[in-house]
Swiss-Prot record:
Pfam families: RRM_1 (PF00076), RRM_2 (PF04059). GO terms for biological process: meiotic cell cycle; positive regulation of growth; positive regulation of meiotic nuclear division. Residues 44-54, 883-894 have a biased composition (Polar residues). SMART domains: RRM. The keyword RNA-binding applies. GO terms for molecular function: mRNA binding. This is Protein MEI2-like 4. Probable RNA-binding protein that plays a role in meiosis and vegetative growth. The lineage of its organism: Eukaryota, Viridiplantae, Streptophyta, Embryophyta, Tracheophyta. It comes from Arabidopsis thaliana (Mouse-ear cress).
Length: 907
């Protein structure tokens, strides 16, 4: 029967439909089941009987059982609030059934229903009706979010790695990375970006202590000096970072952890200009001065007869001790933490090598930042240096702070190592650096980045296993490997057995420079396994896999039209249909694949497989070459082989002559005559990571040209390194009287600085110790060029000048630039005068010229006129009349210019 509609006077009248709306029972869950009658009582819209689309088993019930009336959809746009019939099955079903039915309702069905009412909008959607039906059974978003961030995360940490995966809502590994600078936990929730800080998402009371405070909800109108006064009342402030003040947050770093605690307790929740401050302890990631090697010391090679009280007495003479702890092993080490990081530095310098009870103390810095973590050492390294330590039940964040050379993931904490994410739940664990916080020690092979947590593993000595001459791969910063579902022939995704030790993996990694094979591109690989990875290094069986540089965890982010490099899909390789490419096993007879690694940033998400355009291999060319005369597959000209910083004499071979030489038939080889890369622009980057990228030439080089280029680039690199060393400033050599140079280059000066500002900054520490200063000006941009030259009167004057400026930030303009010093090319006051007195600078305004100072007599320290030469050159296209105008406003220009790389460019 038709639905009743209330007229304005409350008298029910039958509704008259001009069109019928027929919906099959499968499509009307949650809707009123209309059974309309046309005018005259004749059904003219369908020849089918009603029984063909209406189920007799559905019993109608009154909507009065609901707490609120749910409207029916009526073609004339009015809604009924009484006597609306609903399916009784809606209330006989469980809540899960209700949602499952809703999910089974196709979107097209809903659109089909709404198409009959195109001109009228329904008063409420299906989601709104469900929300009314459910009521307040579920908590609101704020309560749920607070529970997840607060208790939920801590419970998951206690339960182990699997729970941590479920609750790691803010991990950037899964594609939530935003431009490479993402706060964890708290910062992502509040939408603040742009700081290189991993912030602990806990209240200041009871969280991991740190000397650095992350202060949110700061009024951007507050002056820096006011903030300095506010925080200095609790102790000496090491640094006050206010670059994010306009976004509502600042960073405060203290020397003494007690001062940070006092500030957090006193200021958390305090109103400052109408805003309630929110203060959290923070752990920095990219600032080495605030990240590690300060605050605490490891004491090694200590006689066991020395008690903790005696040690406390020895070390407390340098400063107040926060804690003294000792390991329980035979060769015990002692951990001593100072409240003040400055005291720890002094103790390290004063006590390292001190003989106590017939043994020389070996001290090493570490920075646990107030945690209760205490690592268990396996044994001494035999050299009295850093102890070896076990990795079981070890938080990676703590590992990174104790031993900065060990790669740690900032997403791992709470005493358990996060398991690798793969389809079969492999127990393999990995330490993967996400945000450039820590790097692998120099020479660490790629396979050493994978660590099995099922067996305690010791740190190897930094001699043999990490020898650069054996691995050919030096410091690999910013590589972010994530492991795919399959590595070689292991369906579990684990390239190592659970009992494989770190040393075994390191020994495997020593063969990395002999070559990699690209196995299992498509079809059946060497071991009959179907997958797509970069496989094992040579001279070993398939039971171990090498480092895989990408995963398919973020496959939804990749453009499938262009394809990925070695995707696991068996149907496509590099976006090319599989039937076009025969199965390929390895580059077996190819010469080494030379890879140039540059330091430009890669902007795709960490952990994502790089997108590779199809022009990488010309589809019109032959993909498989069987000619034994093939000259090899050479990507570009070789520069410095391997990763950044690697030795040029140890190239990283891809497709070595030795790679599976026994395999015949299906091999991929590219003849230099027909294998062409389109361009380095079209060729995407093969390796993930934030810093390294591939630099590939536009075509394959012939062998002679390749080695000629290699030799040329080697010589360039060697000469550049030698030149840098020539201008490096060594304070020890100055103190020993071995270096008598006096002219320095000051680099990384903020571009808004004027000569007057620079003089004021220098005179604050070193007034009267210099006789020449020159700050070059860029007249086009009306600002300084970022560096200056100064000549000290005596070489000994360099030492206090170095201590005052080198490595320090500039005070003005809130600049993040850090000053650095190097020797100038031209040395001495007389040589500098001779260099400039005939230059075009003499035609410029006096304020743009070099400045000379009296060094003796009553006028010592005052400026003296710069002598003019007899042959002054003119600057092309520039008249002297414009020089003053160019100079007057140069201090207001942008602070975004590039500085030179070393101290030998201008002078």
């Amino acid at each position: 029967m038709p639905s009743d509609i209330l007229e304005p006077r409350g008298v029910p009248t039958p509704s008259h439909f001009h069109e019928d709306i027929r919906i099959t029972p499968e499509k009307q869950f949650g809707f009123m089941k209309n059974n309309p009658m046309p005018e005259g009582g004749v059904d003219r819209s369908s020849n089918l009987p009603t029984s063909s689309w209406t189920s007799d088993s559905y019993q109608l019930s009154q909507q009065s059982s609901l707490s609120g009336a749910l409207p029916s959809f009526i073609p004339n746009g009015r809604t009924t609030t009484n006597d609306t019939h609903w399916e009784s099955s809606l209330f006989s079903s469980s809540l899960s059934d209700l949602f499952s039915r809703k999910l089974r309702l196709p979107r097209s069905d809903k659109l089909a229903f709404m198409s009959a009412n195109r001109e009228e909008e329904p008063s409420e959607s299906l989601e709104e009706m469900e929300a009314q039906t459910i009521g307040n059974l579920l908590p609101d978003e704020d309560d749920l979010f607070a529970e997840v961030v607060g208790e939920g995360v801590h419970k998951s940490r206690a339960n182990g790695g699997d729970d941590l995966d479920d609750c790691d809502l803010f991990s950037s590994v899964g594609g939530m990375e935003l431009d490479g600078d993402v706060f964890s936990s708290v910062s992502q929730r509040d939408g603040k970006r742009g700081s290189n800080v991993s912030t602990v998402a806990e209240h200041p009371q009871g969280e991991i202590l740190s000397r650095i405070l992350f202060v949110r909800n700061v009024d951007s109108s507050i002056e820096d000096c006011e903030l300095g006064v506010l925080f200095k009342q609790f102790g000496d402030v090491r640094a006050l970072h206010t670059a994010g003040k306009n976004r509502g947050f600042i960073m405060v770093s203290y020397y003494d952890i007690r001062a940070a605690q006092k500030a957090a307790r006193a200021l958390h929740g305090r109103l400052l200009r109408g805003r309630k401050l929110d203060i959290r302890y923070s752990i920095p990631k990219e600032n080495p001065k605030e990240n590690s090697s300060e605050g605490a010391l490891w004491v090694n090679n200590l006689d066991s007869s020395i008690s903790n009280e005696e040690l406390h007495g020895i070390f407390s003479s340098y400063g107040e001790i926060r804690e003294v702890r000792r390991t329980m092993h035979e060769n015990s080490q002692v951990y001593i933490e100072f409240f003040d990081v400055r005291k720890a530095k002094v103790a390290l310098q004063g006590l390292n090598g001190l003989e106590v009870a017939g043994r020389q103390l070996k001290l090493a810095p570490t920075c646990p930042e107030g945690t209760s973590f205490w690592p268990q050492f396996a044994s001494d390294d035999g050299e009295g240096g850093l102890p070896k330590m076990a990795f079981n039940n070890l938080s990676s964040a703590h590992m990174g702070r104790h031993f900065p050379g060990i790669l740690a993931s900032t997403s791992i904490d709470g005493g358990s190592i996060r398991g690798m994410h793969n389809s079969v739940g492999s127990p393999m664990n990995s330490f993967i650096e996400r945000h450039q916080s820590l790097d692998v020690p120099i020479g660490l092979p790629p396979s050493a980045r994978v660590i099995s947590a099922s067996k305690p593993v010791g740190l190897q000595e930094f001699g043999n296993p990490f020898d650069n001459s054996k691995t050919g791969i030096q410091s690999m910063p910013n590589l972010h490997p994530h492991f795919p579902d399959y590595l070689d022939n292991f369906a579990s995704g684990s390239p190592y057995k659970s009992s494989t030790t770190f040393s075994e993996m390191v020994s495997d990694g020593q063969k990395a420079n002999e070559g990699f094979m690209m196995s299992n591109v498509r079809g059946v690989g060497v071991d009959g396994f179907n997958g797509g990875v970069i496989g094992s290094p040579i001279n070993q069986g398939s039971h171990r896999g090498n480092l895989n540089l990408w995963s398919n965890s973020n496959s939804q982010q990749h453009n499938q039209s262009s394809g990925m490099m070695w995707p696991n899909s068996p149907s496509r390789v590099n976006g090319v249909p599989s039937q076009r490419i025969p199965p390929v096993t390895a580059f077996s007879r190819a010469s080494p694949l030379m890879v140039n690694m540059a330091s430009s940033p890669v902007h795709h998400h960490i952990g994502s497989a790089p997108v590779l355009n199809s022009p990488f291999w010309d589809r019109r060319q032959a993909y498989v070459a069987e000619s034994p005369e093939s000259s090899g597959f050479h990507l570009g000209s070789p520069g410095s082989m391997g990763f950044p910083g690697s030795s040029p004499s140890h190239p990283m071979d891809f497709g070595s002559h030795k790679v599976f030489s026994h395999v015949g038939g299906n091999r991929m080889e590219a003849n230099s005559k027909n294998a062409v890369l389109r361009s380095s622009r079209q060729m995407p980057h093969l390796f993930t990571g934030r810093s390294p990228m591939l630099s590939v030439s536009g075509s394959f080089d012939l062998p002679n040209e390749r080695y000629r280029n290699l030799s040329h680039r080697r010589s360039e690199s060697n000469s550049s390194n030698a030149e840098k060393k020539l201008y490096e400033l060594d304070v020890d050599r100055i103190l020993r009287g071995e270096d008598s140079r006096t002219t320095l280059m000051i680099k990384n000066i903020p571009n808004k600085y004027t000569s007057k500002m620079l003089l004021a900054a220098i005179d604050e520490y070193c007034k009267g110790t210099y006789d020449f200063l020159y700050l070059p000006i860029d007249f086009k941009n009306k600002c300084n060029v970022g560096y200056a030259f100064i000549n000290l009167i005596e070489p000994e004057n360099i030492v206090p000048f170095y201590k005052a400026f080198n490595g320090k930030k500039w005070e003005k303009f809130n600049s993040e630039k850090v000053a650095s010093l190097a020797y100038g090319r031209i040395q001495g006051k007389s040589a500098l005068i001779a260099h400039f007195q005939n230059s075009s600078l003499m035609n410029e305004d006096k304020r743009c010229r070099p400045i000379l100072f009296h060094t003796a007599g009553p006028n010592a320290g005052d400026q003296e006129p710069f002598p003019m030469g007899s042959n002054i050159r003119s600057r092309p296209g520039k008249h002297r009349t414009n020089s003053i105008e160019n100079y007057t406003n140069f201090s207001s220009s942008s602070d975004n210019r590039d500085e030179p790389a070393n101290g030998n460019d201008s002078m």
